[in-house]
A protein has these predicted regions:
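A short amphipathic beta-strand at an alpha->beta junction
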Residues: 75-95
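N-proximal, solvent-exposed amphipathic alpha-helical segments enriched in charged/polar residues
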Residues: 1-36
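Flexible domain-boundary/linker segments
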Residues: 37, 41, 66, 80-83, ...
Length: 98
């Protein structure tokens, strides 16, 4: 195959969800990613992550951090034409003091 030829490949919705979930879990204050969905429309990746957060966390900052980490991972690994990521804080976890 010539290096200048176009090379077509696809990344499944399952793989996109896994990339976003793995990256999102790295954000401080995330206890779990409860659900996630992914779809690709005309080259634009649409993702939704539902997060269980640690009680007392800055929820706005946490959601932005999850969104940014997921976006950076998807951009680096997939290079989509466009990216739309939404984050919902679905639940809070009260964890015992350390």
């Amino acid at each position: 195959m010539d290096e200048e030829q176009d090379f077509a490949y696809a990344v499944s919705a399952k793989a996109l969800r896994h990339i976003a979930e793995t990256a999102g879990r790295q954000a401080s204050g995330v206890v779990a990613i409860r659900s996630r969905s992914a779809a690709v429309t005309d080259g634009v990746v649409h993702l939704h992550l539902a997060v269980r957060a640690r009680y007392g966390s800055d929820l706005h900052g946490l959601a932005l951090d999850v969104q940014q980490r997921a976006a950076e991972a998807i951009d680096a690994m997939v290079e989509p034409e466009g990216l739309d990521i939404s984050v919902t804080i679905e639940d809070l976890a009260v964890l015992p003091a350390e």
